[in-house]
Amino acid sequence: MICGDVFANRRPDPVLQQIEDFDDGTVSANDCFRPVARYFDRISRPEHLLTALPRAMAMMTDPQNCGPAVLAFCQDVQAEEFDYPEDFFTPRTWRIRRPEPDPREVADVARMIAEAECPVIVSGGG
């Protein structure tokens, strides 16, 4: 998920994303995504994308650690320009490792289905 966040320079104050936590100026409403995201990064400089985007993609395509990724873009950073290296835009193929099923488990499931009177299969979910 890509969402807007507070201003990195903190000049516009208050903004919608801020919550009433006067002890910590870094807390925003987007922090609510931290507990449910496998990867969370607040983009407060344009060059942060050079590391954050590949990390987010790696997390989302790793079968062991996969999960949602959240990139929270500070509003003023969204309007900044940055001279990204050309190779950053080279198309990439993200290959997802697919572990093979355990042959014993496949045999057990096949036996259970064959022995069932009215088998029902709910598939999906990884």
Tell me the role of every PLM-derived stretch.
Residues 1-126:
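N-terminal alpha/beta PP-like core and its mobile active-site loop of ThDP/TPP-dependent enzymes
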